[in-house]
From Swiss-Prot:
UniProt entry keywords in alphabetical sequence: Cytoplasm, Schiff base, Thiamine biosynthesis, Transferase
Catalytic activity: [ThiS sulfur-carrier protein]-C-terminal-Gly-aminoethanethioate + 2-iminoacetate + 1-deoxy-D-xylulose 5-phosphate = [ThiS sulfur-carrier protein]-C-terminal Gly-Gly + 2-[(2R,5Z)-2-carboxy-4-methylthiazol-5(2H)-ylidene]ethyl phosphate + 2 H2O + H(+)
Function recorded in the entry: Catalyzes the rearrangement of 1-deoxy-D-xylulose 5-phosphate (DXP) to produce the thiazole phosphate moiety of thiamine. Sulfur is provided by the thiocarboxylate moiety of the carrier protein ThiS. In vitro, sulfur can be provided by H(2)S.
Group of enzyme by EC: transferase
Protein name: Thiazole synthase
Superkingdom as given in the UniProt entry: Bacteria
Source organism of the structure: Citrobacter koseri (strain ATCC BAA-895 / CDC 4225-83 / SGSC4696)
Protein family per UniProt: Belongs to the ThiG family.
One family name in Pfam for this protein: ThiG
Protein residues bound to 1-deoxy-D-xylulose 5-phosphate: G156, A182, G183, N204, T205
Length: 256
């Protein structure tokens, strides 16, 4: 069970809505993933009507919607988008994204912290997408963010946990949930993140661009479940030396 702010989730896999070939395929994949929290870019939906091709199927699926501010380049733009989302969708939950450079889509740490502090004061449950910077994540936690979402690698790159060393520090020091976001390309990446101690992962591109998105969503569901189970089982410690799994000489002594 994962708790963030005022909500609890059985699944530790969050999903996105971009890059799917159709809204029907998107919903089928989300259902197959078991995800209960789905993020969507406000710039891609028609907020004036709930029969939007993306929004309507998600509402029907009964998932928790996490609007994001993707496309915002400044704190002011992100705050404006957040206010529109709250008014249109009736949710105070928000994934805060501010990335000024469209080529790399890396989060702006200064603007993200500025916006996060303002949005928390306005009553939002803020989940900021941020770099894998332990100092920044601690600052975001201190201003009241409900979770932090450090990247594993650039958005959509499928590179995996390239920031592993920093993620380990973030996880160790955090007192709010840590959701590894961006760069996860295959199910084993998700398993590794959960084994490290992350509370959840957010996956979009890896599922949406697969030849069979529904099957890939199922694979991620199982991978996340395996990661959570492995962490709870408490793996053995790593050793620089070999450790025998059975006596090496006992049978010789017994036969002597």
């Amino acid at each position: 069970m994962l708790r963030i702010a005022d909500k609890t989730f059985d699944s530790h896999l969050f999903t996105g809505t971009g890059k799917f070939a159709s809204s029907q395929l998107m919903v089928e994949a989300i259902r197959a993933s078991g995800s209960q929290l789905v993020t969507l870019a406000m710039k891609r939906v028609d907020l004036r009507q709930h029969n939007d091709a993306i929004l309507a199927p998600l509402i029907d699926a009964g998932v928790t919607l996490l609007p994001n501010t993707s496309g915002a380049k400044t704190a002011e733009e992100a705050i404006f988008a957040a206010q529109l989302a709250r008014e249109a969708l009736g949710t105070h939950w928000l994934k805060l994204e501010i990335h000024p450079d469209a080529r790399w889509l890396l989060p702006d740490p200064v603007e993200t912290l500025k916006a996060a502090e303002a949005l928390v004061k306005q009553g939002f449950v803020v989940l900021p997408y941020c770099g894998a910077d332990p100092v920044l994540c601690k600052r975001l936690e201190e201003v009241g963010c409900a979770a932090v979402m450090p990247l594993g690698a650039p958005i959509g790159s499928n590179q995996g946990l390239e920031t592993r060393a920093m993620l380990e520090i973030i996880i160790q020091q955090a007192t709010v949930p840590v959701v590894v976001d961006a760069g996860i390309g295959v199910p084993s990446h998700a398993t590794q993140a959960l084994e490290m101690g992350a509370d959840a992962v957010l996956v979009n591109t890896a599922i949406a661009v697969a030849d069979d998105p529904v099957m890939m969503a199922q694979a991620f569901r199982l991978a996340v479940e395996a990661g959570v189970m492995a962490r709870r089982a408490v793996p053995g410690t790593r050793s620089s030396y070999a450790q025998a799994t059975s006596p090496l000489t006992g049978f010789l002594e017994a036969s002597a």
